[in-house]
Amino acid sequence: MGLSRLGIETAYIGKVGSDEEGRILLADFEREGVSTDFVIRAEGRSGTAMIFVDEKGNRAILVDPGVNDTIAYDEIDVDSARKYDLIHLTSFICKNGLDSLNSQKRIVEEFDSVSFDPGMPYAERGLGDMEKILKNTTIFLPNRQEIEMLFSEDYRTAAERCIEMGIEIVAVKLGSEGCWIKKGDREVTVKPVSTKVVDTTGAGDAFNAGFLYGYLKGKDIEECGRLGNFVAAKCIEKYGAREGLPRSVD
């Protein structure tokens, strides 16, 4: 949704249940200009999340994945999805099975450009379980805790290992310290945008949207980092993961 607001043609691959939550989710995507052509409708509950925010804007999330964990590879229209320039992956909870994770391990082989944000659910699964996805990743977008958990090393050393695995760009989110990016032998640190923190929900995804916007527009990695920090800063100025997402980077 963050990329769609910035004018990038986007589509969502996922699964929703036959309930009101699923209907609301699809309506939200369509209202924001995100194609739902690849959304699978199924019997059962849609995934939901309860988000708790403290007085400092920090948050905790309780997730019920519902049918989200049950996306079989054969349910995805991969041929039609290939028209998009990039596919972005993030973590499933894997509480109700490994179908969705296993589908991700297959679909990464079908695209030339893959971006991947592991989230804590995948970081906790360990490097062995994530290796196939990582070896097919173009842009890796972890935060510091996630990459250090995956590789059991500091983030700079871990990023070097990522490059050795064939990943083109590693962009590590450092929270209030901004971000650190590595591409080949080049390393840059990009300072954060000063802002008033209201709610950190969605900050990582907002950064991803800004960074990938820059990448898709052919920007230098440092400018991609600035765009990521900018979109994340706008996001955390308001409550919720979407309310603050900008419609322009100007």
Swiss-Prot record:
InterPro entries: Carboh/pur_kinase_PfkB_CS, PfkB_dom, Ribokinase-like. Pfam families: PfkB. Its EC number is 2.7.1.-. Coiled coil: none annotated. It is an enzyme of class 2 (transferase). Keywords: Kinase, Transferase. One of its GO terms (molecular function) is kinase activity. It comes from the Archaea. Transmembrane segments: none annotated. Belongs to the carbohydrate kinase PfkB family. This is Uncharacterized sugar kinase AF_0356. The lineage of its organism: Archaea, Methanobacteriati, Methanobacteriota, Archaeoglobi, Archaeoglobales.
